[in-house]
Amino acid sequence: MSNQPPRETMTPEERHRERMQRKKELIDRKIARATIDRGVLVVNTGNGKGKSSSGFGMLARSLGHGFKCGVVQFIKGTFSTGEEAFFRQLTSDQLDYHVMGEGFTWETQDKARDIAAAQAAWAIAAEMLANPDYDFVLLDELNIALVKQYVQLEQVLAAVAARPPRQHVVITGRGAPDGLVAVADTVTEMRVVKHAFDAGIKAQKGVEL
């Protein structure tokens, strides 16, 4: 029999404690059911801000755990970003960082060049995905290359499926293909509510760059 007093006689503080206790028990049961321990595939997509930012946050977390990490940026190649400046200054064998893109396709206006850059980026990414030394791999803006068909989805799905069992992979970019979403463990879709750019505010260092 519960030692809790009837709810109608509880004080607001007692009701709050009861609600929090029920919530804790529910969360504890969910945690107890999660017994599988393996690498996960995370996909960040959508038209909102935060896809790459989330990926780089997980990169920082992984480095903090002492993981061997690899980054391949498929698009962002013609302008400097704060994340690249920060992570490149880490003088550690923990991190391999590659910026392979030549900018967005409307900047190059050269499809053959864009395809070549994407294929070169994918070659490095595929090596990382096959290498058990890498605990965490971030493939930033790979979805853009998939949407443009500069990299073939079948290649990516095969490499992800065959990767070392404890390797975590994060893929970012809008327009994630359905086939990638289907095999991912965690998928987050960022949605725009408001964006400063629409009000004429240019991209800001520390926020977008």
Predicted regions and their residues:
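Extreme N-terminal, non-catalytic leader segments
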Residues: 1-40
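Short gly/ser/thr-rich secondary-structure transition/capping motifs
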Residues: 24-27, 118-123, 169-172
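Short glycine/serine/threonine-biased micro-segments
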Residues: 37, 46-48, 171
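Short coil/turn connectors at secondary-structure junctions
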Residues: 38-39, 66-67, 133-134, 165-166
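Generic detector of well-ordered alpha-helical packing
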Residues: 74, 141-142
